[in-house]
Design a protein with these regions (language model features):
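Short, conserved catalytic/metal-binding motifs centered on acidic residues
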Residues: 6, 145, 344
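A contiguous strand-loop segment
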Residues: 2-128, 148-280
Length: 494
């Protein structure tokens, strides 16, 4: 999937949380309805079979309950996408990334080959359809997630290039696949944030640590030999740069990928570097934009939502630009694009008890026109308003309501923008107020069963607030667009 990811280490976040967030985007010309749900251990099969690649994988015992964002319409696989398990481990998968012919020629992708004549079918590897479902229920730390997924990649291979994030309350790890069976992973330093458009991102890698103490780096077992045999290290000084070795520097990156990283880095570090003009240190087309940076101030969930909603506001590249030189308008792929399916921001709060530590912030449809809302992740079920998405358009659920608001607001942008700004702030404020209220109730409740009920009660209250404000905003945006219809006439009937 075409996506955008932000990772924030605990010392870089406003409250000591680890935070991982990703826009899940459909490919061009497609939209994928999503639902926010809980998958229970008893729902998991003993053997998993991929719909797309037909690979079959036995699943271990001891699965954990986890939240997920699967496709609302069945038929093309689960695509669990993002969630938190009962051990407070978060995972988001995947960020589609890039590679190069040197890598793909040395370790080809493991693609499904259908039966032909007397030849039986040959299953493919694992991919975005499968990864969260195969990994998240079976891990108890972010590092365990890297190791389990790495083992699956080495054994079964993959048919696509992907980046995957794992978190617990202490650590964030980012894994990138290399060819069909290889991978690297790096622990995100506590004091930085990471921005990831759709290209291989890790820009430094310590092989000595990966094959030694493994404190900050992990990789596939034969990576050293793989690099040497295929002459993949392009460095002059012996310091491996994975982007050069395994990634891409294509013209398409300069309109589709690097501008997104540039905008996010520029937002959180506006004074660290020069971002524009003839003397710029970095431009939207720079290939050497840092994978991670120490921010100039601590990062909030609202910052993450703003960046993941970006359409290059405040730059000449904004597709909604209405004044000045418009020659570069819409030149680059927006982060908040029309085909955002959902955004999930997973937050592990260290100042809260384990059972209420994980908060999952959710947004549906185009981020440029929506709002996000927090929910407790340690629950047995999710509110119907976010879980009952169907293939048919309906204002009874948050996904389709958000899609309708976005489509109408886009067509009435100047008139509807202030409604959207008020909507987003109102939902964020009310959502935070309800979480604060229920955090206090949970802290005062000695009974574990009652606390579990309170978490679901909180989510129900948050969803009710959200539904009311979303319906009100839909009404206002519909009015603005209706007022702009071409058959409008300024004179009323006598």
């Amino acid at each position: 999937m075409a996506c955008t990811t932000i990772l924030v280490g605990k010392a870089a976040s406003y409250d000591g949380s680890t935070m991982i967030a990703r826009n899940d985007d459909s490919g061009s010309g497609h939209f994928t309805a999503k639902k926010f749900t809980v998958i229970h251990p008893e729902e998991l099969p003993k053997t998993y079979r991929s719909v797309l690649s037909h690979v079959e994988i036995p699943l271990p015992e001891g699965a954990l309950r986890f939240t997920a964002m699967p496709n609302a319409v069945e038929g093309k696989g689960i695509w669990a996408a993002s969630g938190v398990n009962a051990a407070n481990v978060g995972m988001t998968a995947t960020e589609t990334i890039t590679s190069n012919p040197r890598v793909l020629g040395a370790d080809p992708l493991v693609e499904y080959q259908p039966a032909k004549g007397e030849k039986p079918e040959v299953p493919g590897g694992i991919g975005e359809e499968d990864i969260v479902y195969l990994v998240l229920p079976y891990i108890h730390s972010a590092r365990e997630g890297v190791l389990r997924l790495g083992s699956l990649l080495e054994q079964y291979g993959t048919y696509e290039m992907n980046g995957i994030a794992f978190q617990d309350v202490n650590e964030i790890w980012w894994l990138e696949t290399i060819g069909g069976h290889h991978w690297i992973a790096r622990r995100v330093p506590d004091d930085v944030y990471v921005v990831m458009p759709n290209q291989l991102g890790i820009d430094t890698f310590d092989l000595e640590d990966a094959f030694g103490a493994q404190e900050n780096y992990l990789c596939s077992a034969d990576l050293r030999e793989f690099i040497a045999k295929n002459h993949l290290d392009l460095s002059l000084d012996g310091a491996l740069n994975p982007r050069d070795a395994f990634g891409s520097h294509d013209d398409a990156d300069h309109v589709y990928n690097t501008p997104r990283a540039w905008y996010m880095l520029r937002y959180l570090n506006p004074r660290t570097w020069v971002w524009e003009g003839a003397d710029a240190d970095y431009t939207p087309m720079s290939d050497d934009l840092p994978w991670c940076m120490v921010p100039e101030r601590k990062v909030t969930p609202e910052d993450i939502k703003y960046m993941l909603s970006s359409h290059y506001q405040g730059t000449p590249y904004d597709p909604y630009l209405s004044y000045g030189d418009k020659s570069a308008k819409g030149a680059y792929r927006s982060i908040g694009i029309n085909r955002n399916d959902f955004m999930a921001l997973l937050q592990m709060r260290p100042d809260q008890p384990e059972e209420s530590r994980a908060v999952e912030w959710v947004a549906y449809a185009s981020n440029a026109f929506n709002t996000m809302v927090p929910f407790y992740a340690n629950v047995e079920r999710t509110p119907e308003y976010l879980a009952n998405t169907t293939g048919a358009v309906s204002t009874d659920n948050f996904y389709w309501t958000s899609r309708l608001i976005a489509a109408m607001a886009d067509a009435s942008y100047n008139k509807s923008l202030f409604h959207l700004e008020r909507y987003e702030e109102a939902v964020l404020s009310a959502g935070r107020a309800l979480v604060n209220q229920y955090d206090a109730k949970l802290a005062a409740e000695p009974d574990a069963a009652r606390r579990a009920a309170l978490r679901e009660e909180a989510n129900t209250a948050i969803a009710a607030m959200l539904q009311e404000k979303a319906a009100d905003t839909l009404d206002k945006v519909l009015f603005e667009l209706s007022s702009q219809m071409k058959n409008a006439y300024s004179r009323s009937d006598a």
